[in-house]
Amino acid sequence: MARMVQCIKLGKEAEGLDFPPYPGELGKRLWENVSKEAWAAWLKQQTMLVNENRLNLADLRARQYLARQMEKHFFGEGADVAQGYVPPSN
């Protein structure tokens, strides 16, 4: 049976992550409060931030920026939006 969490991002109970996706205390908070669905949405957002801002993940500052954005995305006011991004209309 899948592990269920009360997802902080989706505001509902959903299937939890299989393991902490990030080291340390932040990884533990993510594992306890974020669903697989919300994590998949973050990975798409993160990819846009990396591509649009031309981040070099070998650079410590780029990795720190992404960690701050991840924390804001799940536990704060929301991550930055990739400049020029227009969400698809349904």
UniProtKB/Swiss-Prot annotation:
Entry's family note: Belongs to the Fe(2+)-trafficking protein family.
Keywords: Iron
Gene Ontology molecular function terms on file: iron ion binding
Name of this protein: Probable Fe(2+)-trafficking protein
Organism, as annotated: Variovorax paradoxus (strain S110)
One BP annotation, GO: cellular response to oxidative stress
Keyword Iron attached: yes
InterPro entries reported in the protein's UniProt record: Fe_traffick_prot_YggX, Fe_traffick_prot_YggX_sf
